[in-house]
Amino acid sequence: MYDFEPKMNALVPMVIEQTNRGERGYDIYSRLLKERIIFLIGGVNDAVASLICSQLLFLESENPSKDIALYINSPGGYVSAGLAIYDTMQYIRPQVSTVCMGQAASMGSLLLAAGAPGKRFSLPNSRIMIHQPSGGAQGQASDIEIQAQEILKLRSRLNDIYVKHTGQSLDTIEAXMERDKFMSPEEAKAFGLIDEVVEKRPGSIGDGAA
């Protein structure tokens, strides 16, 4: 289910389960997927988005009414890839609970905030960061202008998404997004990016429970 680099494959533990037909082995991430747990680890790109979206859709087909848990430890990445994950989270019928562990920066913070209301969590030593999208432009002046306009449109769209999920005003979001804004979990809760800071997991957090 997961496509890791060769060096990373050696570091992914295998889980052996006994069945009526003998032993069956899973990599740890595929085993956790059976419990409706998905991991977003590392940068957000098209390959990662394809994996996350396909798992969300698969779990919806398995049970459209049972929650899905998305654990996030990401520095962010490509806006288009992040929005593909975001749209899929909103599109499917199960509610998606989000949990930040380590960091949720840039698009990672947007996906953290996009979890189901009341089901957005952070571990106590995580860091959360929001900022405006960036991009490089090259080519003719007219091409640079077109790319700059597209970045401005993306910034406006991202601001609207943060407004929707945090409850902050557009002016507040625009001001906070102007530069990198790092937050502790407590600050992220006050800002509306998450609902709770958790040290121990209650049964309803991160186990795919409805």
Swiss-Prot record:
Localization (cell): Cytoplasm
Chain ranges passing through the membrane: none
Any Pfam family the entry gives: CLP_protease
Record EC number: 3.4.21.92
Active site: 106, 131
Presence of keyword Cytoplasm: yes
Protein name: ATP-dependent Clp protease proteolytic subunit
Origin species: Azospirillum brasilense
Biological classification of the source: Bacteria, Pseudomonadati, Pseudomonadota, Alphaproteobacteria, Rhodospirillales
Gene that encodes it: clpP
